[in-house]
Amino acid sequence: MSSVVSLAEISRAARPLNWLDSIIKGDCVAALNALPDHSVDVVFADPPYNLQLGGTLHRPDQSLVDAVDDDWDQFASFEAYDAFTRAWLLACRRVLKPTGTLWVIGSYHNIFRVGAILQDLHFWVLNDIIWRKTNPMPNFKGRRFQNAHETLIWATPNAKAKGYTFNYEAMKAANDDVQMRSDWLFPICSGSERLKGDDGKKVHPTQKPEALLARILMASTKPGDVVLDPFFGSGTTGAVAKRLGRHFVGIEREQDYIDAAAERIAAVEPLGKATLSVMTGKKAEPRVAFNTLVESGLIKPGTVLTDAKRRYSAIVRADGTLASGGEAGSIHRLGAKVQGLDACNGWTFWHFEEGSVLKPIDELRSVIRNDLAKLN
């Protein structure tokens, strides 16, 4: 079960990781400033939208629209909102690991201001994502287009950031083996997923659908990563993170939201380890040199390798190079040379004989990779 901790407890904590899988009660900037540097893999932020509602909204039948009119969404001016945005973004960057990324979601009311400030602070935008809603709220007055989407910005802490997580192969496989696009179609949160109080009213006015958070976490985190949400609300980020085997840290100042989020997260059952395996491409696999096969004894010096049709042959030398007809070089260079080509993938071109069957040396590389995976 997730715990709820105060800012005072975080500040005087002797153990630096006691805030994992917890909801910190307090102001987001103060809470962020109490966390260790470079301790978070991903930030998902759903900040106040600063809707600037001029009054109550009514449907054509004069029933009241359940819009966001809470105090936490009220700012005296755009300047005040911008100052608040700069403060929490800077605090998030401090806690992000150098390989970490930040997601922020907003509507047309705030996302352009947030995006401009992000770039002013030298965050580096990787993508903007359109969340297209299958069931958006109508424009009741008929004076504008129906607002049917929200925008997400995905960014690294700076332009030179390297090594961030993007599970490209998993996203492609989930999209019927076609590259995942930057426009995502999800319904707004409704039905049994929508948290409601004893009075039947929504617990939180802007609760995000779990499917949206699941895609974000599956795309940009690994099992065991730490996901921070500085505007935790009803705890969607924490619930999805727990289910997907990620750690979470939530920051929230409203006790009613904290209570609802803690109860919600406590009811979540994490998925099994085997279920959480993420598909990876060859680029994500550990690099194995051909010489490693020789050093490990999988291929012995003096072994004769051929192509699949036995047209070309080469002898394996003790230093991990190949020799053929007075030429010598790497598996790739010699493979290209004997064919008269500019380039060659030696792993799939050269074959070894097992019994009477020719097999690509890439199979032996897989043996080494599997051994490395067991060590990790």
Curated annotation (Swiss-Prot):
Disruption phenotype: Essential, it cannot be disrupted. Residues 273-370 form the RAMA domain. InterPro entries: DNA_methylase_N4/N6, DNA_methylase_N6_adenine_CS, RAMA, RM_Methyltransferase, SAM-dependent_MTases_sf. GO terms for molecular function: DNA binding; N-methyltransferase activity; site-specific DNA-methyltransferase (adenine-specific) activity. GO terms for cellular component: cytoplasm. Its EC number is 2.1.1.72. One of its GO terms (biological process) is methylation. This is DNA methyltransferase CcrM. It comes from Rhizobium meliloti (strain 1021). The lineage of its organism: Bacteria, Pseudomonadati, Pseudomonadota, Alphaproteobacteria, Hyphomicrobiales. The gene is smeIM.
